[in-house]
Amino acid sequence: MAWPAARVETFSRLLAVELGNHGIRVICLRSDAIPDAIPLSYTQGMFDDMTRRFGTTTEAWLEQHAKQDTLLGRLPRLEQVADYAAFVASDRAGAMTGALANLTCGSVLD
């Protein structure tokens, strides 16, 4: 997943350059898997297929991933990502653009 993420991050920075002088801010939100959002999205099938090949369930894999692969021992909640998105869209973050917000609970370090 590193290459697709890097492409999205680079694209967001290019958008910030192109749109900044029009007063448009661009902030890229990088999150890890969001367990409470998975059942609501197309990713449920992707996770189910992957974990079935590993001989486990999506829920068990997410729990293990959170404990072993994140610094905080958990994964981000949808509410946390939404709260941050609302903040960076607000005037309180009006000076911010061309930035990457790492909301991975420490699974990816910048």
Model-based region annotation:
Residues M1-R7:
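The catalytic Tyr-X3-Lys active-site helix of short-chain dehydrogenase/reductase
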Residues R7-L15, L19, L29, V88:
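Hydrophobic alpha-helix immediately C-terminal to the catalytic Tyr-X-X-X-Lys motif of short-chain
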Residues G20, R25, M96-G98:
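Short, small/polar-rich loop/turn modules that mediate ligand/substrate recognition or access, typified
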Residues N21, I34-D69, Q80:
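A glycine/serine/threonine-rich, flexible loop-to-helix segment
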Residues R25-P35, A89, N102-T104:
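Conserved SDR Rossmann-fold cofactor-binding beta-strand/turn motif
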Residues R74, A86, A93-D110:
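Short C-terminal tail/terminal secondary-structure segment
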Residues V81-Y84, V88:
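Non-catalytic, hydrophobic alpha-helical segments
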